[in-house]
Amino acid sequence: MLRVFVVFILFVHFVRAQKATVKYINTNINVDGKFDESVWSQLPEYTGFYNYLPTDIGKAKNQTSVKLFHNQEFLYVSAIYFDSTEKTQVSTLKRDVSIAFSDAFVMILDTQNQEQNGYFFAVNSLGNQTDGLVGKVNDSYNLNFSWNTVWQSKAMLNGTKKQYEIAIPLKSLNFNKNNTSFGIQFYVRDIKNNSWTIFKNVKRNFANLDLRFTEKFFIEELPEKSNSKFTVIPSISTNYQKEVDVNTDQTDLTPSIDLQYNVTSSLKFDATINPDFSQIEVDQQVTNLTRFSIFFPERRNFFLENSDLFSNLGVSGVNPFYSRRIGSNSDIQFGIKLSGNITPKTRIGLLNVQTSKEVVNTSQNYGVAVLEQQLSKNFTSTGFLINRQETDGFSFVNNYNRVAGVNLNYKSNNNKWVGLANYGKSFNNQIIDKNDFYNLSVWYNKRELEAFASVKKVGKNYLTDIGFTPRIYNYDAINNLVIREGYMESSLGVEFKNFYENSKTLNFVRYLNYRNNIYFDENSSVNHISHFLNSAVFFKDMSAVYYVINYDEVNLKYGFNPLKTANPIIPGKYNFATLKLGYNSANNKLFSYRVNVQKGTYYNGKRISSGAYLNYQILPFANLELSYDINKIDLKELGKNTFHLARFTGQIFFNNRLNWTTYLQYNTQQHNFNVNSRLQWEYKPLSYMYLVVSDNYNNFLHRTNWGIAFKLNYRFDF
């Protein structure tokens, strides 16, 4: 009897696998959201979506039906969400904005079926597109919206039904003809009900982007290679800058070109010549009260496709490659990149960028080589070599920094355990010791319980000129020196929560979220212990109330000047703690907000802070955001200061192609008031015109500089 039962279970799984098929049908459709072509009636229907949020129990009340096929040129998808109302709600008509605040349909594709990286395609209920790349980062996955490709979509409101029709060119996807199985996930966001529903069942302790939980679809008759080989994007930009204090100005005219060549359907070559990044959105400013640098994300498109190959070579706080270092002090002359799969289980990444010589900066050549190999279902290894070399014309100067390393990733069959081991070594002129980096991390993830532990050691000479290792650089505010010092860090954390499926009020309660970090100096003496304790109550509408307690024990070795005055904090032992209380409102309303207050000690003094974030939507024409943070620090005889950080973002959507965004940022810590206003017109798919105005003032609202930039590009696909 047991044998019969086992055979039956295997048969059921076999039948399900056979049903998950993307059929090949040699026909085209008109993407209009109407589904009136006969081919749609011939295709199997994929439905039975599960709840994901605010509950992950059972099948969804409002179901979704998905059909899909390909014709060796396009992957066609139709989706119908059976809503309970004719109303719809979207927060934006701007491309590449999170769909978390809109009614939308999402498809995720893992074309290599390696659970490492994938594609993200989303359409909101008014037809606005969002695309991006999903990449694995340690124990989870993140989403980068800066990657773009040309694809077609149409959304249609048909009574209570929300209909989505999509056509994705296969030429835009990395795939291997010998790998006929794609990992595919669908999910639907209904902002009106504040719900998420998903095709392949995923519990909420895992991200809905998690590529380990995709449905495996068999792809019939994949094409041998991409039909299109080239994408060329020439552009022209002009930039006027006026320095008010010194009464100088400068006008630049910059032609540039980007191209992409599909070596194979899974391996791509990218090149950029004389790139201009004047259209890139400004960074969101922060108040930094720590002793170390802050990480900001990469936004430049050239560095983004297959970016997980290059940017995921280390761990948080120790990353040997941080692409934002490239071009930060001098302009990029050219860059080339070869990235993708050379076999179904082998990925490579080769990157080379040359910067120009400036008045105070020498020209540099940056190179990165990465090899990623899937050893088994559970293990993946990565080896890398990074090089920065000073150049003089076509010659190399003996001034370099090189970093080599190897990483080993592990994931268990039940997806509850993830492990990571890292080793790196830095090579520099006349530096031969204390130049290593080690790390060992493990994560455990269960629905009610999550935990992690890690230990890493960083030598003071683990120099990564194009990396991000802020903690080895210690600024001595008394002697105005930067001292390199290695360290060892041990970390652990645990989070326990309980879900209340039958409650009319509570969604879940995070009873305990505790993290501990201990830092040892090169002599194995403890110089910093940090404790983080948090609990939160989440209600059915996803609003939340929470508290956070931070407690730090610091053995300060060098002078620290957070007030930016003439009286830095002197070296010594300090214990300080803060308590923060906060409330986040439901985010599916036209008006939403977050508020918090914090009070406690700070080194030898006191700290009081508060913050507020307000968002108001004028659907679907505008989105207004306002945030304000204040930090009052009193260090007794050393002085006191108050830091203000205010941000306003106003977005106006004229239609799906034309929008106007304005940022106002006031940061007293940086003595800056900044205005950045950008008009963006997508006059042809992924061909843009930008008009950007920037204006900078000091704390006293005295103008320091201003500028205006115009950029026009055009995309050719051959």
Language-model regions, residue ranges each:
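Bacterial Sec-dependent N-terminal signal peptides
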Residues: M1-T21
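A short, polar/proline- and glycine-enriched secondary-structure boundary/capping micro-motif
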Residues: E86-L93, T130-L133, F175-K177, I280-D283, ...
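One face of beta-strands
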Residues: T64-V66, D103-F105, Y119, T149-S153, ...
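Exposed, low-structure sequence patches enriched in small/polar residues
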Residues: D331-Q333, S339, Y400-N401, N414-F718
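Outer-membrane beta-barrel transmembrane domain signature of Gram-negative proteins
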Residues: K203-N227, S356-N414, A544-V595, S609, ...
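Catalytic-domain carbohydrate-binding cleft regions of carbohydrate-active enzymes
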Residues: I166, T248, D258, K268, ...
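Structural preference for beta-rich elements and adjacent junctions enriched in aromatics
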Residues: A17-E372, S381-G383
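A generic beta-sheet turn/junction motif
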Residues: H70-Q72, A100, G159, L375-K377, ...
